[in-house]
Swiss-Prot record:
The gene is rps18. Residues 83-103 are annotated as: Disordered. Gene3D superfamilies: Ribosomal protein S18. Part of the 30S ribosomal subunit. It comes from Glycine max (Soybean). The keyword Plastid applies. This is Small ribosomal subunit protein bS18c. One of its GO terms (molecular function) is small ribosomal subunit rRNA binding. GO terms for biological process: translation. Keywords: Chloroplast, Plastid, Ribonucleoprotein, Ribosomal protein, RNA-binding, rRNA-binding. Belongs to the bacterial ribosomal protein bS18 family.
Amino acid sequence: MEKSKRLFMKSKRSFRRRLPPIQSGDRIDYKNMGLISRFISEQGKILSRRVNRLTLKQQRLITIAIKQARILSSLPFLNNEKQFEKSESTARTTTLRKKKYRN
């Protein structure tokens, strides 16, 4: 091989394919909270299909199951993990405004 052709040939890296997030025996159902909670973000949002690595049909079923669980109040609509602490109230200097009288 010529040197110029060798520069363009890259070695192929082997990659390990990740396991699918939903196994064949898993039932996508609103009662299966362990499965559903894997597809929700920390904020309580439904994660996208690319992030989940799901098929279109699986994503649709997951979305429906999450919405059913929210309606039946098994899942919260918003997941506020952050507890807002009461910050020390900043001392406001309130000055009384004097009314200006126009003659």
